[in-house]
Amino acid sequence: MLKITLKDGSVKEIEKGSNVLDLAKSISNRLAKEAVGAKVDGKTVGLNKELNENCEVEILSFEDDEGCDIYRHTSSHILAHAVKRLYDNVKLGIGPPIKDGFYYDFDLEHSLSDKDLEDIKKEMKKIIKEDLPIERKVYKRDEAIEMFKEMGEDYKIELIQDLGEDEEICCYQQGDFIDLCQGPHLPSTGKIKDTALDLLKVAGAYWRGDENRAMLQRIYGTSFIKKSQLEEYIQRLEEAKKREHRKLGKELDLFSFHEEAPGSPFFHNNGMIVINELIDFWRREHRKAGYQEISTPIILNRGLWERSGHWDHFQENMYFTEIDDEDFAVKPMNCPGAMLVYNNNMYSYRDFPLRVAELGKVHRHELSGALHGLLRARSFTQDDAHIFMLPSQVEEELENVINLVDRFYSVFGFNYYVELSTKPEKAMGSDEIWDRAINALKSVLEKRGIKYIVNEGDGAFYGPKIDFQLEDAIGRSWQCSTIQLDFLLPERFDLTYIGEDGQKHRPVMIHRVIYGAIERFFALLIEHYEGKFPLWLAPRQAVIIPIADRHMEYGKDITKQLESEGIRADLDQRNEKIGYKIRDAQLKKVPYMLIVGDDEVENKTVSVRTREDGDIGSKSVAELVDEIKVEIDDMD
């Protein structure tokens, strides 16, 4: 009998050769019903995996990330199977599970439409009802290439040829459909809930993300274990469409994109007002937190990028130019320039901690298919900061940065959790340095009572990091802020300080961003607030709406009074009906609508409507100004 150690530490005995599903059944029928796979000694496997030695096993359900991936990966194979049944001359690309669903890439002559998606979904449901067993098969390299050659699957052959000579070629088969895949998968197609499955859209995708390769058709889908979960997800998608920043950006006249500069946003006046408010807030908070601000050039020479490592490891994402027969690059990151600024002076241990921040414009060559409004652009502004310190100051500085991040996100109403990424297999720096840094990160998070997830071995080779995952108003997660201990750049740029002993030492360096990219953070705010910015951020804080031409002069006086108090106010002078003007202001998400007519002119008042509460009655201009200023000042 084998001894199987379960997640709760208990030990279960089971016969050798039993599979994971047998183990789940021996624990409880409910667990067996919910099981979709398992982790055996940390490796994710399917329910058919045989157990032949003592091991640790964690049974996975759909609620586990790895279990959800198994379920949706099987869904993607059913999608590919259905497409192969319905259309001739189909060549398969890849079909992985992704966050909230799955996709599969196809090379086929037929251009897929919404009606095709309905037909494909019906065929998928047939395959599910057939409850075809899903079998794992292993082939020799030559056998696999020959098999896929006979099937005309050129892309699969390319993938096999990219594998190592001795690597196991694994495939999964259901009925007459077979696919190159490492798995794992569910035991049969019938394990997918056919009423909780949907196909969402078709998009173009270059093979292997290379715009010089074939354009494939990518079908996106999702699947759940309950119909109610699918319905909730579709509802969230509909809500997300209403909040889509590209749609609202156009409606609110915030920004635009043009073919003359693909992937680079053009900010309009309304958008610049919001951006500048974000920057002003950033500068105020950083001054209070003891940061210096620097600015470094956008174009720097090849030697710098070779020294930083970007020339060798990031070149495909960079833009280049030649000046006076010398190679230069447009900066994709601010960090190397900040290292040059540090090296311009000699620092003493008494100067630490040294906090240096920069709002630097960077450019990165993203593939056109990956661009997505402000969320994925080719030019953006990073709010980088580098903190140089003594080893004894690490924990205190980490706490200071986390406090600053928390301050920012609380102002915007974001909840968040943290992911801590630890030392990978290949890393620079001693175990002692890494352990000290990781323990400092953990200590600060626990001291602050911040929940965090540990991603073992997922840190960069040059240091551990924590990522802040924001949760927006409709429950989506976004990664923005990162706090990274960097052991690499201080070495590459030979950063030093004079210690108490009079000798040169290497400083500890933290690299951090809070907004991340300001433009991307702006997009998140648009969607988070659904365009209804809080008063301090709103491009137009008030609009004055005269009922008739005879009220226009009074409207102009009010506008001047508000503007003189620093309130962003516009006068609607259009020759339109009052109802139209009010509706238009509501569509433009203006916080305050101030209507003026005969009574208001006579009494020197305004009739006030707010975006959230509608008509709130008549107020004097002075009273309203005081209320607006208090609301602006009370931004947090």
Curated annotation (Swiss-Prot):
Residues 1-61 form the TGS domain. Gene3D superfamilies: 3.10.20.30, 3.30.54.20, Anticodon-binding domain (3.40.50.800), Bira Bifunctional Protein, Domain 2 (3.30.930.10), Threonyl-trna Synthetase, Chain A, domain 2 (3.30.980.10). One of its GO terms (cellular component) is cytoplasm. It is found in: Cytoplasm. Keywords: Aminoacyl-tRNA synthetase, ATP-binding, Cytoplasm, Ligase, Metal-binding, Nucleotide-binding, Protein biosynthesis, RNA-binding, tRNA-binding, Zinc. It is an enzyme of class 6 (ligase). The keyword Transcription regulation does not apply. Its EC number is 6.1.1.3. It comes from the Bacteria. Residues 244-534 are annotated as: Catalytic. Catalyzes the attachment of threonine to tRNA(Thr) in a two-step reaction: L-threonine is first activated by ATP to form Thr-AMP and then transferred to the acceptor end of tRNA(Thr). Also edits incorrectly charged L-seryl-tRNA(Thr). Belongs to the class-II aminoacyl-tRNA synthetase family. This is Threonine--tRNA ligase. It comes from Natranaerobius thermophilus (strain ATCC BAA-1301 / DSM 18059 / JW/NM-WN-LF).
